[in-house]
C-alpha cells in the first residue's frame, strides 16, 4: 500500500511539480527522499536553496512522513535539530495530504512564520518584537548556509 502510494506521488510530482519545490527518492530507496525548496521571493530566504529529507513510514499515508531540513535555517518553527513545527506533519495529518502539499505548506511557513507555536522561542520573540532584526539574521543565515 505505502509503496504504491509513494510511486503515485512521485509520478504526480514529475507531472505537476509544486512551485519552487522538488522531491524524489535517494537512490533506490523509495521510503527515503530528498526535497529542495527555493527560498520564496517575498521572504528573507529569497535566493536560498534549502534541502530536506523525507522519510516515509511503512504505514504511509495513514501516518505522516518525517520531514526535516538538512540546510540550516533561522526560523521560529524550525529548530537546530532541523525539526519542523507544522500541524499537518503531526496532529493534523490526513491520508488525503501529499508530499506536494506538505512542501507547499513548508514554503508558506517560510513566508509566514507562526511565532505563537514556536520550536525556538527566542527567534519567535525577535520575530514579534524586532522584525527588521529577524529579517536581517534570516538573510545572513540564508547567505551563509543556503547559497
Curated annotation (Swiss-Prot):
A Pfam cross-reference name: UQ_con
Entry's localization field: Cell membrane; Endosome membrane
Coiled coil: none
Keyword set, alphabetical order: Apoptosis, ATP-binding, Cell membrane, Disulfide bond, DNA damage, DNA repair, Endosome, Membrane, Nucleotide-binding, Phosphoprotein, Transferase, Ubl conjugation pathway
PROSITE patterns according to UniProt: UBC_2
GO molecular function: ATP binding; ubiquitin conjugating enzyme activity; ubiquitin-protein transferase activity
Protein name stated in the entry: Ubiquitin-conjugating enzyme E2 D3
Organism: Bos taurus (Bovine)
Amino acid at each position: 500500500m505505502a509503496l504504491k502510494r509513494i510511486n503515485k506521488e512521485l509520478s504526480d510530482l514529475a507531472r505537476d511539480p509544486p512551485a519552487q519545490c522538488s522531491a524524489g527518492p535517494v537512490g533506490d530507496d523509495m521510503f527515503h527522499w530528498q526535497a529542495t525548496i527555493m527560498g520564496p521571493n517575498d521572504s528573507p530566504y529569497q535566493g536560498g536553496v534549502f534541502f530536506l529529507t523525507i522519510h516515509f513510514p511503512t504505514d504511509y499515508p495513514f501516518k505522516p512522513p518525517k520531514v526535516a531540513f538538512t540546510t540550516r535555517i533561522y526560523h521560529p518553527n524550525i529548530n537546530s535539530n532541523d525539526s519542523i513545527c507544522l500541524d499537518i506533519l503531526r496532529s493534523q495529518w490526513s491520508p488525503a495530504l501529499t508530499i506536494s502539499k506538505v512542501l507547499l505548506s513548508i514554503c508558506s511557513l517560510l513566508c509566514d512564520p507562526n511565532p505563537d507555536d514556536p520550536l525556538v522561542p527566542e527567534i519567535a520573540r525577535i520575530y514579534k518584537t524586532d522584525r527588521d532584526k529577524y529579517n536581517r539574521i534570516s538573510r545572513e543565515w540564508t547567505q551563509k548556509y543556503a547559497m
